[in-house]
Amino acid sequence: MSVVSAITVTVPATTANLGPGFDCIGAALKLYNEFRFTRLEEGGLIIHVSGTEAERVQTDESNLLYQAFVKFYQHIEQTPPTVKIEIKLGVPLARGLGSSATAIVGGLVAANQLEGATLSQSQVMELAIAMEGHPDNVVPALLGGCRLAATSGTAWEICDVPWHKDVVPVVAIPNFELSTSEARGVLPTEVSRADAIFNTAHLGLLLRGLETGNGQWLKTALQDKLHQPYRKALIPSYDAVNIAAVSAGAYGMVISGAGPTLLALADQLHSEAVEAAMLAAWQEEGITAEVRSLSLDTQGAKSF
């Protein structure tokens, strides 16, 4: 491929961990950020932002999207071109839906496409994981679908996790934020053998439940002892929303990524009732939230 003058990249939101799959599993959702990069012959960096919470996005060289763009050129040992970047935000910031992953993947993919696809998808993925520090958001953001990532220490193995068509992700996005650093700060530095075994078994069951749509397996699988017991205290009325979701027919509810968005899994028959129940539970506590059922994105980052 030849060098091009402009490129647009769309990157999906992601939900990570899915309960027991802490830092190793995530799924792409049909909710997107769009980034357009245009080469400039002169002048300096220009960043325009529109959409969800646009005023909160940095428009200088500290912008994460731009930092990822520059990272690509550092990797190939070239000077990055001067660009105008137009950002259309659809993924809420700092809500546990992978907004930072969209920026990292978007910047790397855009740079790679501007330079004629110099790097393979696997190489782009390795750069994205290195920037993010963990694979569970950037991998599905890049590749789409539900993905499990494991490393031997030198390379990553990525596994596509089949997701049954009758398993519906329902996200409840509150009007408050929770930073990833704060959510990681409450985690213990060591866990017991019993808790490690618990999560290993439940992750295995989760994978089979997602593949088959077996509701009983999912009800059991969506439990965790490594991160959610510590993080849920940072999310007001977590228990009330959980009870409401399950009472309305959800298989279970988990924290999406680092939170504060909550993710319930339900079947097609109960998804609307689960939406309404989660919304009402937070409203009763005076918390405004957007609750919606989303489909799985199977394509990942796209450029045109």
UniProtKB/Swiss-Prot annotation:
Location of this chain's protein in the cell: Cytoplasm
Superkingdom, taxonomy of origin: Bacteria
Main location: cytoplasm
InterPro entries documented for this protein: GHMP_kinase_C_dom, GHMP_kinase_C_sf, GHMP_kinase_N_dom, GHMP_knse_ATP-bd_CS, Homoserine_kinase, Ribosomal_Su5_D2-typ_SF, Ribsml_uS5_D2-typ_fold_subgr
Chain positions recorded as ATP binding sites: P92, L93, A94, R95, G96, L97, G98, S99, S100, A101, T102
GO terms (BP aspect): threonine biosynthetic process
EC number: 2.7.1.39
Disulfide bonds: none
Cited function: Catalyzes the ATP-dependent phosphorylation of L-homoserine to L-homoserine phosphate.
Protein name per its UniProtKB record: Homoserine kinase
Record gene name: thrB
